[in-house]
C-alpha cells in the first residue's frame, strides 16, 4: 500500500460516507484488550481514500479524540474533534481547510438528543439535515470503535522530521530510526531530493512491524497535540 502521499482534503460528507477499510496487517494486531493502556495515545490507519491519524485522551468519565484525514489526492488535510461522556457522544466538530473552508459543530445533551448545530461554508451559515447529523454521528461511533481496536492492539503513530542518515527527530524530541521497508525509505529519499527543507514523515508501529503513512513538506509537529494541551 503506497500510503505516503502529502495530505489532501475532500468535502466532508464524501469522506464520512467512505469505507473504513483498515490496513490489514496493522488491524490484525488490534485484537486483544490491554488494561494498562496510557491515557493519551496516538494511532492511525490507511484506507483506499487516504490516511487517518488519531490522537486520543481517556479519563475516568470522558474520551476526547482528534482525527486528521489526509486524502491521497486533491486538497488539504481535514480534522475532526469528538468528545464522549462515558459512552454517550457529546460533541462533533469538523473542519476542512480549502479555498472554500467548511466547519460543522454539533452538540448532544445528556439524553443524547441534539442540542446545538452549526454549519458554515466560507463563513456563510447553512442548514444541516437530520440525515447529515445522523451520518456524522454514525461515523463518529465507527471511528471510536476503530480507535479502541488500534489502541488495544498497540498500533502507535509517530511523526517527525526526516534526516539524510535515515533517522527522524520525532515531535517529542527523540532521535529514532524507523524500521521501514526499502520502498518506503526510497520514497522518502525521492521526496527529500525535491524539497528545500527536511520533509516530515508519519508512520505506524505495531507488534507486526512498521508502515509508512505520510510524507509532506509541512511540519507535522507544529500542530500535533500533546497530552498536556489536549
Protein language model regions, located:
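C-terminal motif of bacterial Sec signal peptides marking the signal peptidase cleavage site
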Residues: 27-30
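OB-fold/S1-family single-stranded nucleic acid-binding modules
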Residues: 206-230
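Short nucleic-acid-contacting surface segments enriched for D/E, G, S/T with interspersed K/R
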Residues: 185-201
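Bacterial signal peptide processing site
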Residues: 32-34
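Bacterial N-terminal signal peptides that target proteins for export
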Residues: 2-20
